[in-house]
Regions:
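ABC transporter nucleotide-binding domains
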Residues: 2, 9-195
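H-loop (His-switch) and adjacent beta-strand-loop-beta switch element
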Residues: 198
Length: 198
């Protein structure tokens, strides 16, 4: 499903990734763990087509990722630094996601609403706490029904109850649809609890 071979990325002469290889099978929950600055986010930005590699290949389902909108429809990405349109509320972002992702599941959106009872869907997302903004990002992403879910520090800043709830939803999606999940974190203990491979 995900194949990275001999990936090299340089920034102004600094080699952030040096011959990185990674192979993730369909339906796996794969964890990337390491301290800040280890290259986890750089690798993820290649997998999502944000960065173009200096050398090597980055493929999803056998296709190059960079500048490939067909492949990008197949995955949802929750970055560590979430961005929302100014003054957009959850319902407006839902409509935006529906326009971007043909498989967006409206019924699932309303079903998952009960898992996020503290979030007012008509309130500006930017006025919510960072933890609530992460919950909104996850809520919207999972409703796109992605084949691949790419998560960068997804539960950082969430309380224990919400962390468990998020992982429960992810596990149910993997079991139901054989979703492939790639998650990066500095928390090895948490990844060991949820991942097939770390």
């Amino acid at each position: 499903m995900i194949e990275v071979n001999n990936l090299v990325k340089e920034f102004d002469g600094f080699r952030a990734l040096d011959g990185t290889d990674m192979h993730v099978k369909k339906g796996a929950i794969y964890g990337l763990v390491g301290p800040n600055g280890a290259g986890k986010s750089t690798l993820i930005r290649h997998l999502t087509g944000i960065y173009r590699q200096n050398e090597g290949t980055v493929k999803i389902a056998g296709e190059d990722v960079y500048e490939n909108p067909h492949i990008k429809e197949k995955f949802a990405f929750i970055p560590d630094d979430i961005f929302y349109f100014m003054q957009a509320d959850v319902m407006e972002m839902k409509r935006f996601y529906q326009g971007m992702y043909p498989k967006f599941d409206d019924k699932m959106f309303y079903r998952l609403m009960e898992y996020f009872p503290t979030i007012n869907p008509k309130k500006s997302i930017r006025s919510l706490s960072k933890g609530m903004q992460k919950q909104v990002a996850f809520w919207l992403a999972i409703c796109t029904r992605p084949e691949i879910l790419i998560l960068d520090e997804p539960v950082d800043g969430l309380d224990l109850v919400m962390r468990r709830q998020i992982w429960s939803i992810v596990m149910a999606d993997v079991a139901e649809r054989d979703t492939t999940v790639l998650v990066s974190s500095h928390n090895l203990r948490e990844l060991e609890d949820v991942c097939d491979h770390v």
